[in-house]
């Protein structure tokens, strides 16, 4: 019974935390720098890219992730590696091989995965300063389904969401269906 109560209190604390208070989740990036992915500090919001190094769809998005990070510098970006078996050395090698520019965080216990309710990789989640979900879903519509890659992107869902958030407008839709590899 104590365990159930402790779990409930912890979960309630995450849900009820005010601005900056949910930033208790601290992850060291691959360079050892402490990062607070739930606290965008002076940025508009945090953008979490849930990513798995063994997922070909995730890897195909590495250049687009870099372009989004470069064009929307008013957001705090993080690549969240979700594979519980990924070592820091292998993650560093993968980040180098795919030229990932955003800070890479390892989430072997799926703390961020659970909090953001991410289900596949790649999946983007945008969280406001108060921890409020602003957007969750696909980066764009390049994939119509598993193994079904379109010839060209026609909808830039994440870019559109970030532009709408930057403009201070209400986002519709708030969620889109991400296509990718199931989170292990």
Question: Each predicted region: which residue ranges?
Answer:
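A short beta-strand-turn-helix
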Residues: 25-46
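Short active-site neighborhood of thiol/selenol oxidoreductases, capturing the structured segment around
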Residues: 40-59, 162
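Structural microenvironment flanking redox-active thiols in thiol-disulfide oxidoreductases
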Residues: 59-98, 106-115
């Amino acid at each position: 019974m104590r365990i159930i109560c402790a779990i409930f209190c912890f979960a309630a604390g995450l849900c009820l935390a005010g601005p900056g208070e949910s930033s208790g989740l601290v992850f060291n990036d691959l360079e050892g720098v402490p990062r607070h992915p739930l606290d965008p500090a002076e940025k508009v919001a945090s953008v979490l890219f849930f990513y798995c190094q063994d997922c070909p769809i995730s890897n195909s998005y590495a250049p687009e992730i870099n372009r989004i990070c470069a064009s929307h510098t008013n957001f705090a970006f993080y690549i969240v590696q979700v594979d519980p078996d990924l070592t820091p050395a292998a993650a560093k090698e993968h980040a180098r091989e795919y030229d990932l520019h955003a800070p890479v965080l390892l989430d072997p216990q799926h703390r961020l995965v659970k909090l953001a309710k991410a289900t596949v990789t790649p999946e983007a989640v945008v969280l406001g300063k108060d921890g409020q979900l602003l957007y969750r879903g696909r980066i764009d519509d390049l994939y119509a389904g598993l193994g079904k890659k379109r010839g060209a992107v026609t909808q830039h869902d994440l870019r559109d969401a970030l532009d709408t958030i930057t403009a201070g407008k209400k986002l519709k839709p708030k969620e889109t269906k991400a296509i990718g590899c199931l989170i292990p």
